Design a protein with these regions (language model features):
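Hydrophobic alpha-helix immediately C-terminal to the catalytic Tyr-X-X-X-Lys motif of short-chain
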Residues: 1-5, 9, 19, 64
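A short hydrophobic alpha-helix cap/turn motif
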Residues: 9-11, 24, 52, 65
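Short, small/polar-rich loop/turn modules that mediate ligand/substrate recognition or access, typified
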Residues: 10-15, 72-74
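Short, flexible catalytic-loop segment of classical short-chain dehydrogenase/reductase
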Residues: 20-31
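Short, glycine/acidic-enriched loop or turn micro-motifs at the edges of active sites
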Residues: 25, 81-83
């Protein structure tokens, strides 16, 4: 969907990108992050060995909406500590 919308809207100088977040320390994910059993299973699958902080997701979004990404459209940015690498 991201790529389709990016192609359709690019002529209007509208950029469409997606953020693909990894496990992030939020209230929404607390049932996962506060479970020692789950964290014991999940952390080894993340090459960086930790979960993300919300501000790390915010930084990625700030990049995507900034002028530094003015020629970026149709991108799916993985911010997952290398989990999908």
């Amino acid at each position: 969907m991201t790529k389709s919308f990016a192609k359709e809207l690019a002529p209007f100088n509208i950029r469409v990108n997606a953020l693909l977040p990894g496990l992030t320390d939020t209230k929404f994910a607390a049932f996962l992050t506060q479970s020692p059993e789950i964290m014991k299973a999940v952390l080894p699958t993340i090459p960086m060995g930790r979960i993300a902080k919300p501000e790390e997701m915010a930084g990625a979004v700030l990049y995507l909406v900034s002028d530094a990404a003015s020629y970026t459209t149709g991108a799916c940015l993985n911010v997952d500590g290398g989990m999908l690498a």
